[in-house]
Amino acid sequence: MARNAPAFWQTRSLAARLLLPLSGLFLLLAAVRRQLFRLGIRRAVRLPVPVVVVGNIAVGGSGKTPVVEWLVARLRDAGFTPGIVSRGYGGKAPGAVIVPPHGDVRLFGDEPVLLARLTACPVAVGADRPAAARALLQAYPGCDVIVADDGLQHYPLARDVEIAVVDERTLGNRWLLPAGPLREGPGRLRDVDIIIAHGALSPALSSLLDGRPVFAMHLEGSEFRRLDGAGCRNAEAFRGVRVHAVAGIGRPERFFAQLTRMGLEVVPHPFPDHHPFTAADLDFAPGEPKILTSKDAVKCASFASADTWEFPVKAHIAAGAAERILEKLTHGRPTA
């Protein structure tokens, strides 16, 4: 079961310091691994179509899935036919497989199933991203660009554009796993092509990114959809009653705060990221609605009661981001 980030990742506490020797080893291995690909000692797989990776240098939720949805829409607007590859975290599908319409979350993972539903786009999952991409291109030969979800550190897949999604907690205590939240050193952000900032940035991150192309993003939603498809409501319909907000995502407090700002009386129920929900997890007081994130809704639709709702959000990204991505995609040089 995935767990949310420990509190000591944001501080240099004793608990974090005790893990520093392991972080030093992690840093060495990560740096050597990347250099092997940059120097050509290990060969990255170059696909016959361009690849755009969306990721982060830290673990945890920063808003990558809404960015992938936004990116797919912008690519289509520009005349591309995109496909998506993903790790399929939490899924049990063997090898590289295509996610079918209405795929089983237990088999393919929550994020790939959600992306397939949101984008109506071909999605392939697999720990081996090049193999997943090849499977997708074989099944959908008309696909002319691949979007790699959470693929920044997957160097076996060559890429043409790198997008990093960051927020105010990205750097944390600036230490690598397991003492901190970082998968790679902070300087890695200076190498990516586009940085999308979800909300305000910390002073340390703002300083690090000074002079880099940073585009602000916020997530916005306006209606609530019943999980059985029987209707939609706006926030006004939930005012005056307690609502149980359920979130098994990297930053559940962000979801709860968004509902509170809309005037709802929220009872928060945070769960670990990628939590495998059961009906018992949603067993609250009768007559009090339950509101879920889209990522959790795909896991609960088969057993949710009639008073269970999804709150879908869309990424709104500052002007110029799409144009910069498309310029790099069509005229830029491949990124190592």
From Swiss-Prot:
Its EC number is 2.7.1.130. One of its GO terms (cellular component) is plasma membrane. GO terms for molecular function: ATP binding; tetraacyldisaccharide 4'-kinase activity. Keywords: ATP-binding, Kinase, Lipid A biosynthesis, Lipid biosynthesis, Lipid metabolism, Nucleotide-binding, Transferase. It catalyses: a lipid A disaccharide + ATP = a lipid IVA + ADP + H(+). Pathway: Glycolipid biosynthesis; lipid IV(A) biosynthesis; lipid IV(A) from (3R)-3-hydroxytetradecanoyl-[acyl-carrier-protein] and UDP-N-acetyl-alpha-D-glucosamine: step 6/6. It comes from the Bacteria. ATP binds at residues 58-65. One of its GO terms (biological process) is lipopolysaccharide core region biosynthetic process. InterPro entries: LpxK, P-loop_NTPase. HAMAP family: LpxK (MF_00409). Belongs to the LpxK family. This is Tetraacyldisaccharide 4'-kinase. The gene is lpxK.
